[in-house]
Amino acid sequence: TVNAWHTCPEDGAIRGSNPCSEYMFLDDTACNLASMNLLTFYANGKFDAEAYVHATRLWTVTLEISVMMAQFPSQEIAQLSYDFRTLGLGYANIGGLLMNMGLGYDSDEGRALCGALTAIMTGVTYATSAEMAKELGPFSGYDRNKQHMLRVIRNHRAAAHGTAYEGLNVPAVALDHANCPDQALVQLAKSAWDEA
């Protein structure tokens, strides 16, 4: 299942993850991780989506820069991480955000909000990465993996829009538009993937 979402299968299968399972990619690669505290974007009963998008863009650039200055446990991991420009951006404190919004952690609304925030962050990250690649050139494995990467991006877009997927053996769970408590976030998620 995870390999159906693999952006670089021409360079090998995904065979495992890091210990926390947030990073799944090629053997002997690593990525620098960063997490944004979601609660910092919530004030006066409203989630500041504009600030969240801005922070996502800044962290994407920061993580790209960090590839050049990171220390890795071996030369091979350092080289492959440089070659593939791996980065990992996530968020923390979804529970705190949901509690402050009065939403249950396991509620349909809570899951839909989480899905929308994840879709926004991931779509904006991909779009920002593409902007950097346009100016600086893509990572070295892009050309041989281009069609796979673009299919994965189209499938993320399909999940945001709730449309058909390509080449998945297990259908993805689409963004739950109906239960998201902030419809502006649904629209932002869709537009983020339209831009990616």
Predicted regions and their residues:
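Function-dense linear segments that define catalytic or interfacial modules
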Residues: 1-101
